[in-house]
Every structure is written in structure tokens, then in C-alpha cells.
Amino acid sequence: MAWTLLLLVLLSHCTGSLSQPVLTQPSSHSASSGASVRLTCMLSSGFSVGDFWIRWYQQKPGNPPRYLLYYHSDSNKGQGSGVPSRFSGSNDASANAGILRISGLQPEDEADYYCGTWHSNSKT
């Protein structure tokens, strides 16, 4: 009986800690040089964007992904090394989405952009 209870406690803890949202991004986005663009990373229902750190990556053909930035709140955000300040993050709570804004678009910004999350209670 004690082993069964311990196993159930461990399983429920592990199941909860592994639960992650499904992330949805638009398939494509186009804009002109000099314009600003807003890319979204929507979390699935049952999850709140405010509980997660959103990370953004840029990938150009033939290259590995480049880490751009993370965003959790205005007081908890960070820019990757060498990433210009025209790349910025935010959250849109009404859309339950993380946002990557690129201002002053340049030709070299043409790339694939990916988001990822980690939970605010995570220690890793």
C-alpha cells in the first residue's frame, strides 16, 4: 500500500512537471525594409503566457539557430550576445502569446524565427 501511494505521488509530480504548452506561430510573414514586424508565439489553452519565459531564435539557411532573446516581463528579459536592440520581446496576455518585434527591418533579417518556452517554476 505504501509503495502504491509513493508511486502515485511520484507519477503525479512528474506528469505535472513535464506538462508543456503547444506553441503556434504564423507560417509566414512578409514586410518591407525599414518596416516593423510583430511575430507571435501563441500558447495552447490551459496555459498562461505570464507563467512562462519565451525564448526566440533566428535561423538562416545552412546555419544553426541563433539565440536572440528571452522575455518574461519588463523586469525579467535578456538580449543575446550581439543581438541589436531593434529585436525586442513582450507578451500579449489577451492573445496568450509571446511577441517578437523587429523594428527597422533589414535584408539580413530574412530568416526563420522560432520560439520556445520554459516555465517560471523551472530550476533549469
UniProtKB/Swiss-Prot annotation:
This is Immunoglobulin lambda variable 5-52. It comes from Homo sapiens. The gene is IGLV5-52. GO terms for biological process: adaptive immune response; immune response. The lineage of its organism: Eukaryota, Metazoa, Chordata, Craniata, Vertebrata. GO terms for cellular component: extracellular region; immunoglobulin complex; plasma membrane. Residues 45-53 are annotated as: Complementarity-determining-1. Residues 21-124 form the Ig-like domain. Residues 116-124 are annotated as: Complementarity-determining-3. Residues 1-19 form the signal peptide.
